[in-house]
């Protein structure tokens, strides 16, 4: 596992919406291998607070308030599926707008320090990690992590077999 296609979908922040979203995939036998859901409003509130604390807020308060009001209605889903092409088709037909991005997927040892090792290798190579998400089970030897990085090609050269 190295280059993976990640799907990004803005999902309405409403009861039952995730069930509707996953039902469309289930009906067409598309399996979700990894997923991250981020509340858009919480992210923007945190950014607003940090910008205020550092004195680096670049827009007036009413600008942020307008964006916060709009973002309160959505969450962002990032996910990896077993068939990204089919998932895009299914979700598009269900009325969702889907963005596809290439990301790096690594199967890592599920032990303390491995994420530190990987992030250090990427940093030492001058590669920025925009975000990552992943998971492993305590009784499993492996964990799957997804990385969105500034230089995918260079990152893949560090981990050509998809393992650190």
Feature annotation, model-predicted:
Residues 1-164:
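Structural preference for solvent-exposed beta-strand-turn elements
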């Amino acid at each position: 596992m190295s280059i993976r296609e990640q799907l990004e979908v803005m999902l309405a922040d409403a009861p039952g919406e995730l069930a509707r979203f996953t039902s469309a995939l289930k009906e067409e036998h598309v399996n979700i291998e990894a997923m991250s859901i981020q509340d858009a409003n919480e992210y923007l509130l945190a950014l607003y607070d940090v910008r205020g604390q550092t004195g680096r807020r670049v827009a007036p308060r009413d600008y942020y308030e307008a964006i916060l009001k709009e973002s309160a209605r959505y969450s962002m889903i990032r996910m990896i599926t077993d068939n990204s092409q089919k998932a895009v088709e299914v979700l598009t037909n269900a009325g969702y707008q889907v963005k596809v991005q290439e990301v790096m997927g690594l199967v890592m040892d599920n032990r303390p320090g491995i994420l530190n090792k990987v992030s250090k290798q990427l940093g030492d190579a001058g590669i920025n990690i925009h975000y990552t998400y992943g998971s492993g089970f305590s009784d499993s030897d492996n964990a799957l992590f997804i990385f969105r990085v500034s230089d995918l090609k260079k990152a893949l050269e560090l981990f050509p077999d998809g393992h650190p």
